[in-house]
Amino acid sequence: VCVYDCQYCVNRTSNDLPRAMFTPRELADLTIDFYRRNYIEGLFLSSAVVHSPDYTTELMIRTLTLLREDYGFSGYIHAKAIPGADPLLTARLGRLADRLSVNIELPSSKSLALLAPDKKTDAIFQPMAQIKQEILQSKAERQKFRHAPAFAPAGQSTQMIVGASDETEVGGAKRS
């Protein structure tokens, strides 16, 4: 069960639905099996926040470590960074993924407070700033040292929900 109660999300804590979750090994096994059969070319990894942002990020890191280091997975990986997670965990996630993203969620702090009251704007923008810095640092290191590890080499992206509140798309675009 997700620890957040975002009104727009099916996984919200107040939604009384049966829940299911893959273990890191189950997800890695399923991914590598589909990849070897040419059913998929990559993985988009996102998650509800289970227990805490750190715990959830650690599960994601375990999954990607199994794929990259144990199974030799060379396909594309896009992972969602979890706001509130320890920056060291976000850094580790970015060394395993090709692209990282963070959901802005909603176009304003007002709509965030209304529809996702447990989430805070600053907590959302902190990992976005960290990812930007890590990407710039990684590029500089790779110019000096050819074999320096890459950080999210395909970059960073974001998304937001438009239409769940009174804000316009223009306001949302300015925010991002």
Regions found by a protein language model. Give the residues of each.
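Conserved Radical SAM active-site core
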Residues: 1-4, 11-158, 162-169
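Active-site capping/gating regions of soluble enzymes
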Residues: 169-176
